[in-house]
Amino acid sequence: MEAFRTHTGIGVPLRRSNVDTDQIIPAVYLKRVTRTGFEDGLFAAWRNDPSFVLNLAPFDKGSVLVAGPDFGTGSSREHAVWALMDFGFRVVISSRFADIFRGNAGKAGLLAAEVSQDDVELLWKLIEQHPGTEITVNLQDRTITAGTMMVLFNIDDYTAWRLLEGLDDIGLTLRKLDEIEDYERHRPEWKPHTLPA
């Protein structure tokens, strides 16, 4: 997983609350066996509307989604995070995330930045009045900057550390590779062994 330090990209206003994982990517798009190629299913029902924000320039090139409260509710669907990332999003900003979505996002490298709803409203106003406004998100400082506006965001320390280090679950496991190999070397012969890489 690529480490996340800072990201600058066009802000996209998604003025919707309670966006669940089935709205992010409907179940019909979950039949792939790979982890990529899900961008075509992102907000599929809404993208049929030509006036939907992701169908409008410059928002169609955005990488920082500014969403309403309770983003990512519903089922635990890693595909929702993958679809957002496949489309090009690196950050989702909201006043409230579903716990499971927040966890899936952090494990995949998507930053879920939590701010107050007042700050969401100010960001929406700014990027709607000035389409193409770039938003810079600095994970180290936990700041979001857009134009003259600067706000702090919340993220738990553990998820922030994983993102800064670029550690997904496999990366975390590989940090203990010497200990794992030592354990395997000292296991009794009659117990099952893992095959060497």
Swiss-Prot record:
Enzyme Commission number(s) from the entry: 4.2.1.33
UniProt GO MF annotations: 3-isopropylmalate dehydratase activity
Q: Ribonucleoprotein: is it a keyword of this entry?
A: no
Please name the top-level EC class of this enzyme: lyase
| Biological process per Gene Ontology, one example term | L-leucine biosynthetic process
Q: Name one GO cellular component term.
A: 3-isopropylmalate dehydratase complex
What chemistry does it catalyse, as a reaction equation? (2R,3S)-3-isopropylmalate = (2S)-2-isopropylmalate
CDD domains per record: IPMI_Swivel
Which Gene3D superfamilies does the UniProt entry name for this protein? Answer: Aconitase, domain 4
Alphabetized, the UniProt keywords read: Amino-acid biosynthesis, Branched-chain amino acid biosynthesis, Leucine biosynthesis, Lyase
Pathway the protein contributes to: Amino-acid biosynthesis; L-leucine biosynthesis; L-leucine from 3-methyl-2-oxobutanoate: step 2/4
- Show the Pfam families listed in the entry: Aconitase_C
Instruction: Say what the protein does.
Output: Catalyzes the isomerization between 2-isopropylmalate and 3-isopropylmalate, via the formation of 2-isopropylmaleate.
Q: Which HAMAP family match?
A: LeuD_type1
The record's NCBIfam families line, in alphabetical order, gives: leuD (TIGR00171), PRK01641.1 (NF002458)
Q: How does it assemble?
A: Heterodimer of LeuC and LeuD.
Q: Hey, which family's this protein in?
A: Belongs to the LeuD family. LeuD type 1 subfamily.
Q: What is this protein called?
A: 3-isopropylmalate dehydratase small subunit
Q: Which organism is it from?
A: Mycolicibacterium vanbaalenii (strain DSM 7251 / JCM 13017 / BCRC 16820 / KCTC 9966 / NRRL B-24157 / PYR-1) (Mycobacterium vanbaalenii)
Q: What's the name of its gene?
A: leuD
